[in-house]
Amino acid sequence: MSIPSYSAAPGSDSQIHPDGSTGPEPKPKHSMSRTQKILFFTTGWLIVLMPFLFWWNTWFGRHLSNQQLTEYLHDDKKPRHIQHALVQMGDRMSHADVAAKQWYPELIRLADYPVEQVRNTDAWAMGQDTSGAGFHQALLKMLADPSPMVRGNAALSLVRFADAAGRPQIVALLQPAMIDAPISGHVVDADRPGTAVHQGGLLAKVASADSSAPVEIRSPIPGRIRSVSQPGTNVVVGAEIAVVDPGTEQVWEALRALYLVGQLDDLPAIRPYERDLPDISNDVRQQALETDKAIRARAGVN
């Protein structure tokens, strides 16, 4: 029995497939030109490279040579470079690196630097070596800094010097930040209560007839928004517009310091963190209990 053959009709776009079926003839594939390939791979490489370069330039863990450290400490155009150098300094100091002493005068100089984040990091760094000449006095002056975070870090560092002069500032680290409206007007934008916020994070915007643009209200501390006036709310200058609870790390460091220098008067600020609540971590709760116990033991109170 002969097997009939099948062929495509003349002039059609069909062809016979290996299984004997017919179908449209596949269109020829268009390959990218050399220029297109170069552009494609270059774009892909940049997509990967640019975030890496940003991370590399902002990551404070990247090691700096002695020359780079000196340059970064004086880079007024890039305050984050100064912060990077201070973090590296603190690490060297904590490991008793004698070579780090050559930059100690720079740490004292930066104690009144105009950028808050630099002063904040500087206060922490000076606490890494209690033998640093001039550090103690510089930290005492920083207790009067306009920034609550700088005051707090200076107070924490002073504890390493066995100096409890900053105890009120340490207790303040346990308390929420109350933010008042700088102008009278109405809220046009605001974040939601319960939202985590970093230091300097935007909380709300207030518009008034006297200003061409809304005034931004920012958080002075890292933490979580407890309350904030919502859009449409009228506010008057000096009235409370937001409350931010301190972050876990800040609270934990303050409790550790008060374990050493706390007094009975500080217990009302400590005991809220002893509660078994979802927003209080086990580490913080345990530290609060230990701090409470240590303070009462020093005072001879059961």
How would you name each of these model-derived features?
Residues 81-82, 119, 151-152, 251, ...:
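Residue-level detector of extended alpha-helical repeat arrays and alpha-solenoid scaffolds
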Residues 1-29:
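N-terminal intrinsically disordered, acidic low-complexity segments at the extreme N-terminus
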Residues 194-206, 232-241:
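A structural signal for short beta-strand/turn segments enriched in small hydrophobics and glycine
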Residues 77-78, 114-115, 146-147, 178, ...:
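Short inter-helical turns and helix N-cap capping residues of alpha-solenoid HEAT/ARM repeat scaffolds
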Residues 181-196, 225-234:
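Short histidine-centered loop motifs in beta-beta connectors
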Residues 171-187, 202-225, 243-244:
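Short beta-strand-turn/beta-hairpin segments enriched in glycine/proline and small hydrophobics
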Residues 32-35, 59-73, 94-112, 130-144, ...:
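Amphipathic alpha-helical scaffolding segments comprising HEAT/armadillo-like alpha-solenoid repeats
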Residues 88, 125-128, 157-160, 164, ...:
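Core register positions within helices of long alpha-helical scaffolds
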